[in-house]
A protein has these predicted regions:
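Long amphipathic all-alpha helical oligomerization modules
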Residues: 122-161
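A structural-propensity feature for long, helix-poor, extended segments
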Residues: 20-62
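Conserved phosphate/anionic-ligand binding catalytic regions in large, soluble enzymes, centered on
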Residues: 1-13, 110-128
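Amphipathic alpha-helix face/heptad-repeat signature
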Residues: 3-7, 35, 42-49, 81-91, ...
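Inter-helical turn/loop segments and adjacent helix faces that build the functional surface
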Residues: 19-26, 102-111, 135-147
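Amphipathic alpha-helical interface segments
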Residues: 53-123, 135
Length: 162
C-alpha cells in the first residue's frame, strides 16, 4: 500500500509541476503549491510506510508463533497492525482529497493523470481496509473492533463519494 500511495503522491507532484508557472493557471498558483507541498509530505510518509510495514508484520508473525503461550502478545501486535493500517488508510483518504482539490485547479491537459491518481488513492484506501480486516480477526477486544470497523466504513463511504 505504501508504494502505491507514494506513487500517487509523486503523480500529484508531477501534475502540480505541470501547472505551476503556466499562464492559464496563474490565479491558482498558491493553491497548487500548497497541494504539492502536502503531496510531498504524504509521499515521504508513504515511503516510510514501506519499511515500517515489514516491522509491524514481523511483530505479528512472531506473536502468532507464540499465541498459545502468550495470547496477549498476538492481541497487542494485531492491534498495533490495525492502528498502523488505519493510519495508512487515513493518509490514503487525505491523498484522495488532494487529488480532488487539484482536479479543480490543475492543468486540464492532464485529465488522465487525475483519473489515475483517484483510482490509485481509492485503491490504497481499499487495500488498507483489507489489511485492517485481516488483523482484526486476531483481536478479541470487541469495543476496539467495533470502533475501528465503524471508522473505516465511514471513511470508505466518504472516499467512494470523491
Amino acid at each position: 500500500v505504501g508504494m502505491v500511495l507514494s506513487t500517487t503522491n509523486a503523480l500529484i507532484g508531477y501534475i502540480c509541476n505541470l501547472t505551476i508557472g503556466k499562464k492559464n493557471y496563474e490565479n491558482v498558483q498558491d493553491e497548487v503549491i500548497k497541494i504539492k507541498e502536502e503531496a510531498n509530505k504524504l509521499k515521504t510518509k508513504a515511503l516510510n510506510v514501506i519499511d515500517e510495514d515489514s516491522k509491524v508484520l514481523n511483530k505479528v508473525l512472531k506473536a502468532y508463533k507464540i499465541r498459545k503461550d502468550e495470547p496477549e502478545k498476538l492481541e497487542e501486535a494485531s492491534k498495533d497492525s490495525v492502528l498502523f493500517c488505519n493510519e495508512v488508510m487515513e493518509d490514503s483518504l487525505k491523498t484522495l482529497k488532494l487529488v480532488n482539490r487539484l482536479e479543480k485547479v490543475g492543468n486540464r491537459m492532464l485529465a488522465s493523470d487525475f483519473k489515475i491518481c483517484k483510482k490509485y488513492a481509492l485503491s490504497s484506501v481499499e487495500s488498507s481496509i483489507v489489511n485492517i480486516d485481516i488483523n482484526l480477526k486476531y483481536v478479541q477486544d470487541k469495543e476496539f473492533k467495533e470502533k475501528i470497523k465503524n471508522n473505516y466504513l465511514k471513511k470508505y463511504e466518504e472516499a467512494k463519494k470523491i
